[in-house]
Amino acid sequence: MYGIEYTTALTFLISFLLLRYMLKSVVKMMDFIVYKFLLVILILSPYIKAQNYGINLPITGSMDTAYANSTQSETFLTSTLCLYYPTEAATEISDNSWKDTLSQLFLMKGWPTGSVYFKEYANIAAFSIDPQLYCDYNVVLMKYDASLQMDMSELADLILNEWLCNPMDITLYYYQQTDETNKWISMGSSCTIKVCPLNTQTLGIGCLTTNANTFEEIATAEKLAITDVVDGVNHKLDVTTATCTIRNCKKLGPRENVAIIQVGGSDVIDITADPTTTPQTERMMRVNWKKWWQVFYTVVDYVNQIISAMSKRSRSLNSAAFYYRV
């Protein structure tokens, strides 16, 4: 009896040791296969390029770009402020140290030296082609010009709001705007936009799809054009593509780290395309026009009240994304 029990125990022990050995062998083999597979992927990954394809893609190309906060290397700074002004301001002031003077005045308002950046632009037309806003807070000074009301209004609409944009191939496709937030934005040295609305049979309504001269012209030789057409209707477009880039864009909402100060003019420019809404926005302000020194003094005096109507963010508007991002 005892011999049978010893034999059973010995058989069980041998089976256990054999199973343990087999499991260890399997684990070692799997480790070898996995590590070898990862090594092959690591070696081949620099030489492999993949592309995702989709159908009916939504509007996804952003005009915003993430950027490293310019104050990160300076621990004593908490925020940056960019003040954009036209060239004529510097020309009128004609003082090589005027920026240093303003920096000292901003310091007295709580903005440390080095946290305020002065950005010059040639004129509204030039700024419309390539607006770039990089600071935590951005304040744009625009001198009122009756002949440039439309340019000022569209520039304000562009920089005071966030947009998602996709390229448009107007030679192959018809396009329609889905709702009031959907616009076509054109930028370039000269943008002339013509449209031909289509019926359900894709025949032109009041125009011939084969003759661009019969299209309705809705923008002529503009630097920046935000086009709004009848929603839900297909349109054939004719655009001066040699000097202009057009994108299908959707307005997401306010870009709250940007404010515009209109210098002069009787009323603040209306930037709202929808006639049923109140045009005024807290970040669209106006100061009286006297001299540029007076304008800058006013900005310094009210800078903290202006900032209180804004929200800090670490994203920037870079119009280069408008031209190149898909």
Curated annotation (Swiss-Prot):
It comes from Rotavirus A (isolate RVA/Mouse/Brazil/EHP/1981/G16P[20]) (RV-A). Residues 1-50 form the signal peptide. Residues 165-167 are annotated as: CNP motif. Residues 237-239 are annotated as: LVD motif. Glycans are attached at N69. One of its GO terms (molecular function) is metal ion binding. This is Outer capsid glycoprotein VP7. Some rotavirus strains are neuraminidase-sensitive and require sialic acid to attach to the cell surface. Some rotavirus strains are integrin-dependent. Some rotavirus strains depend on ganglioside for their entry into the host cell. Hsp70 also seems to be involved in the entry of some strains.
